[in-house]
């Protein structure tokens, strides 16, 4: 069971745009090509202009946006052909590949094969901007190698993006039953080394900056002296600009580093043999991250602010606490200990906290093969624990839903002309309700267990009610400025809920499903639902996809 982040942006975490790329995009705002590009730099700048056009269309027309991204990628490749060591072109092309992957592959509900007039993109060769993770990783490795050949400092954003891609590889491997765990450990090591290098560079650069601050004569920054306010404000703006590494930048890298540990821990399928190699690998690096984050919070946060830097917010501190708690939970293999961990009052009561708690419980259930089928063949004490786990998950998801719903009510008050991510929030609440429906569906099928059998009909009705509510909410528009990807997210959740309801109510003939959902929609979602054993009792395996 997976949940989208409590961040309501269409993408949770994409690649960073480097300063050189930003400068090129800014340049294109003032100039345009009046002649055919000739040099490597010409193609680089033209690619940057096309990429900016793709960004502008992303909210309203995914097909048009993708076509611009393809043009940009083609121009970056031309630039590389003309100059085999043009680092900016290598960086931009690798970053764009991951951006397109994030927007068009990872975003729930978006299917690139449903888009129109994108045949030039879907060529299944190296010229396409739509690539798999292996190709994206190789592109980042090529960019890093060019920087080494040039013997120039590797751009910090390139290092960060490379680490993020490696983490994504680990996360995707969770669904691969044939994954090689030793290979996953190697990827983890590479990702950790990437982020360790980045942290070293960022911390050193920030310490150098602090040294420069301390070298400024005290009177120069005395806001009590006449006419000093304006100069101090200008100096502070300069120091907190993106040209200088800030505490918030370092914390972002720390959070990304923790997510590497989280990703490898979620890949553990045999706790007894795999946990120790993972601990040996991640513990030294986690200690470094812990030390850095403690120093940042103690000296450069809203709890103890520094006047001349971008201080870490309380929200960011909360995010740090939540991900560290999740890592602690994934290190455990005892459900009762896990329940106690997430019950702590020291963890921020955010939607993300409660969704991760539910996910954490599900991870341990999966790791130990605690499924409805296996539990129904076990003694009562195992059923007690399984029931408690499902109940804890339901309680956590209910709290997440309440928090998200309150955020939804607040955002609805915002003037309709603003882009506030309301559509993504609607999709997220719908997903949480669907997850709760799945939990109740499992709770009503624990055979030979009194609480389940006694409340069977109530729990089944709860599941149906949650699905109906999810359908209704997912059908609610996200405002005038809703992005097209948000609409697709909502539509995906609506289909998820409707197909489940059809199965539970026995409306599962081909004609019924075609009429209610449309064939393309239900046949796309059916394989996912068939993997959930708790729908077997309702005849889901009797539904066959008709031949085309």
Residue ranges of each PLM-predicted region?
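Amphipathic, non-membrane alpha-helical segments in soluble helical-bundle scaffolds
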Residues: 37-41, 62, 130-133, 155-156, ...
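Non-catalytic interaction/regulatory modules that flank or connect domains
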Residues: 186-189, 262-340
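Short coil/linker segments at helix-helix boundaries
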Residues: 53-71, 99-142, 168-197, 201, ...
């Amino acid at each position: 069971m997976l949940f989208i982040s409590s961040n309501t942006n269409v993408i949770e975490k994409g690649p960073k745009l480097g300063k050189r790329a930003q400068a090129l995009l800014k340049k294109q705002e003032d100039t345009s090509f009046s002649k055919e590009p000739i040099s490597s730099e010409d193609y680089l700048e033209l690619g940057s202009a096309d990429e900016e056009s793709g960004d502008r269309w992303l909210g309203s027309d995914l097909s048009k946006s993708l076509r611009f991204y393809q043009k940009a990628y083609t121009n970056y490749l031309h630039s590389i052909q003309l100059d085999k060591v043009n680092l900016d072109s290598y960086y931009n092309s690798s970053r764009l590949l991951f951006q397109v992957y994030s927007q068009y592959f990872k975003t729930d509900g978006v299917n690139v094969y449903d888009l129109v007039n994108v045949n030039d993109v879907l060529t299944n060769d190296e010229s396409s901007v739509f690539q798999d993770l292996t190709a994206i990783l190789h592109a980042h490795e090529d960019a890093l190698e060019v920087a080494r050949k040039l013997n120039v400092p590797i751009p910090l954003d390139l290092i960060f993006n490379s680490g993020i891609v490696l983490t994504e590889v680990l996360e995707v491997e969770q669904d691969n039953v044939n994954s090689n765990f030793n290979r996953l450990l190697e990827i983890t090591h590479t990702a950790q080394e990437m982020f360790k290098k980045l942290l070293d560079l960022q911390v050193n650069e920030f310490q150098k900056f602090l040294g420069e601050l301390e070298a400024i004569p005290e009177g120069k920054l005395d806001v009590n002296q006449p006419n000093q306010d304006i100069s101090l404000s200008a100096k502070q703006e300069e120091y907190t600009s993106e040209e200088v590494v800030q505490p918030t930048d370092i914390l972002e890298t720390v959070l990304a580093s923790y997510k590497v540990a989280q990703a490898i821990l979620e890949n553990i399928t045999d706790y007894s043999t795999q946990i120790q190699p993972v601990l040996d690998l991640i513990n030294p690096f986690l200690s470094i991250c812990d030390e850095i984050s403690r120093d940042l919070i103690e000296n450069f946060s809203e709890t103890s602010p520094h006047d001349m830097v971008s201080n870490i917010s309380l929200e960011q501190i909360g995010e740090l606490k939540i991900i560290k708690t999740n890592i602690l939970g994934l290190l455990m293999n005892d459900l009762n200990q896990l329940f106690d961990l997430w019950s702590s009052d020291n963890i921020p009561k955010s939607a993300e906290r409660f969704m991760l708690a539910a996910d954490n419980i599900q991870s341990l259930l999966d790791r130990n093969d605690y499924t409805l089928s296996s539990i129904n063949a076990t003694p009562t004490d195992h059923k007690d624990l399984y029931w408690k786990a499902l109940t804890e998950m339901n309680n956590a998801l209910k709290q997440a839903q309440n928090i998200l719903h309150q955020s939804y009510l607040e955002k609805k008050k915002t003037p309709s002309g603003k882009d506030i991510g309301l559509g993504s929030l609607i999709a997220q609440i719908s997903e949480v309700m669907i997850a709760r429906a799945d939990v109740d569906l499992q709770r009503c099928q624990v055979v030979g267990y009194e609480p389940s059998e006694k409340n069977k009909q109530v729990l089944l009705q709860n599941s149906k009610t949650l699905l109906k509510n999810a359908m209704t909410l997912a059908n609610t528009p996200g405002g005038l400025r809703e992005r097209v990807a948000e609409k697709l997210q909502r539509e995906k959740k609506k289909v998820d809920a409707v197909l489940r309801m059809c199965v539970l109510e026995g409306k599962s003939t081909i004609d019924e499903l075609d009429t209610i959902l449309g064939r393309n929609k239900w046949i796309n979602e059916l394989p996912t639902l068939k993997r959930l054993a708790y729908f077997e009792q309702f005849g889901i395996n009797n539904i066959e996809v008709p031949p085309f």
